[in-house]
Amino acid sequence: MSTAPITDSPTSVAASELRRAPLLAAVDSLAELFESNGRQAELDRRLPQAVADAMREADLFWMKTPLELGGSELHPLHFADVMEQIAYHDISAAWATMIGNGTTGVMAGWLPEAGADDLFAGERPITAGQFTPRGVAVPADGGYRITGRWGFGSGIGHANWIVGAAFIEGTHDILFFTAPKSDATVYDVWHVAALQGTGSNDYSVDDLFVPEHRTMGAYGATSSRTGHCFRMPISIFISNEISPMAVGIAKRAIDDMVDLAKSTARSLTGVGDLIDRVPFQKAVGQA
């Protein structure tokens, strides 16, 4: 029996904390790139390729991917720390990163071994899509023939794989699947008032054969991965992804408000800048 301290385990919280450090440093180094491209992302209605490429180089799309497949396999709280920091600089970049991490993490963590091998066989996967069952999967020899159309494919512009969900024909059973993006049709429909840069377009597949090893049941799926993160249900695995982004943009709003208050005078009161007013200081403190 091993007597090594539990902190020496690659799946320990302490080990995850060590892997978090370079990711946070990478986000800091990309801060100017995020912020200088934010407006362009809104105009293009997708992340600029330069931003997506930089995040790829910084390994920011594989924070929830198992160690065995080259991912960071961060503890949920450490993943939240990184997501909060990205959102502080650019919420659209954070949203696309969140989707890529969650969908890749689910597929890498719960697909059969052969399916994960397919996913990681070539260029490292950046996945996009969602798991609402908007399709039908017809059983076929060795897999399923899937037809459906899904919305909110955030990050699909820079992705190379898609994920989706479908009801198995004639049942209420839900199937998750993944396929190369080249097998799907993408629809340019993302004309919205906010989060334009996420590029959350629709996508579809039509009678696409997906081998069984690239599918998994939505309920009761078990993972063969060794990390603690993959012992929890999929719904819990992805449940911490949105809240840290809300914290990040809230912190940015407070900081921007304080900066604005430093140069905003209240001439009617005879007081100088807004930053000097006690009610304002109290409100910032409460926030």
Predicted feature residues:
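Generic beta-strand structural signal
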Residues: 126, 133-135, 142-144, 160-164, ...
